[in-house]
From Swiss-Prot:
Protein name: Gas vesicle protein F
Compartments where located: Gas vesicle
PANTHER family the record matches: PROTEIN GVPL 2 (PTHR36852:SF1)
Family according to the record: Belongs to the gas vesicle GvpF/GvpL family.
Keywords: Gas vesicle
Region ranges (C-tail): 234-244
Positions of the UniProt region annotated as C-terminus, modifed ferredoxin fold: 110-233
Highest taxon of source: Bacteria
Region: N-terminus, residue numbers: 1-109
Function as written in the Swiss-Prot or TrEMBL entry: A minor component of the gas vesicle, may be involved in preventing GvpA aggregation during gas vesicle nucleation. Gas vesicles (GV) are hollow, gas filled proteinaceous nanostructures. During planktonic growth they allow positioning of the organism at a favorable depth for light or nutrient acquisition.
């Protein structure tokens, strides 16, 4: 039993039926043209979908399949968006935001979003920071085994934190220097885990991704085993498709 329509994204052109065989709940995916905008959708079995790994992957896979077929300009919609009627889309989205939607399509045309997430080993970096600063290491070692007052604890903690932060910023600056000038736009987001030190998305010309990927690989080789770099070269442009 269906209770509405599950929406995946908006395109500036019709998407052929059958391009994506299955979407959420194994339902076939279709497109609906409304006032010049093509909405990718499938029948919804629920009014609200939990953000399970299976559902999230399916949502992303639908958009990626369409992108791989050549429909690369799109505005992805958030996971779990279910509507009752197309009239609600017109009233709540198209009518109030039509100009902004067209501006976003113009901005994203011929562009793609890629992203990097950089991880390091916190404990290794802490030890390396101390080894690179003999004076700090000597001061830290001299305090070990002693009953320190709060002021002393804060003092040595701040010195160590500042040293580690400089190492982190030096790494991040390498990525900025070598990648930012290749992008039309860069958005840096907060790290998502304790061992993640950098999280950035880049809007780049579609055909320049291979060159961008080579730059990421060169940086990876520069740092060797010190870093783990997670590079995503095919993702719907969530970061750059925000309605203001």
């Amino acid at each position: 039993m269906t209770v509405g329509l599950y929406l995946y994204g908006i395109f500036p052109e019709p998407i052929p039926d059958g391009l994506v065989l299955q979407g959420i709940d194994n339902e076939p995916v279709h497109s609906e043209m409304i006032d010049g905008f093509s909405f990718l959708y499938s029948a919804a079995h629920k009014e609200k979908y939990l953000a399970s790994r299976r559902y999230l992957i399916c949502h992303e896979k639908v958009l990626e399949t369409v992108m791989e077929a050549g429909f690369t300009t799109l505005l992805p919609l958030r996971f779990g968006l279910v509507i009752k009627t197309w009239e609600s889309v017109t009233e709540q989205l198209i009518t109030p935001y039509k100009t902004q939607l067209k501006e976003l399509f113009a901005k994203l045309s011929g562009q793609r979003e890629v992203s990097i997430k950089i991880f390091w080993d916190n404990q290794w970096e802490l030890q390396a920071a101390l080894e690179s600063n003999p004076k700090l290491k000597q001061e830290r070692d001299a305090m070990m085994g002693k009953n320190l007052n709060m002021e002393e604890i804060i003092h040595i903690g701040q010195l160590i934190e500042a040293t580690v932060l400089r190492r982190k910023q030096d790494i991040i600056q390498v990525f900025r220097d070598q990648l930012n000038h290749r992008a039309q736009e860069v958005i840096e987001s907060d790290p998502m885990t304790d061992d993640m030190i950098y999280n950035a998305a880049y809007l780049i010309p579609w055909e320049q991704e291979p060159e961008f990927s080579q730059n990421v690989e060169a940086i990876d080789q520069q740092f060797g085993d010190r870093l783990r770099i997670r590079y995503n070269n095919l993702t719907a442009p969530y970061t750059f498709a925000q309605l203001i």
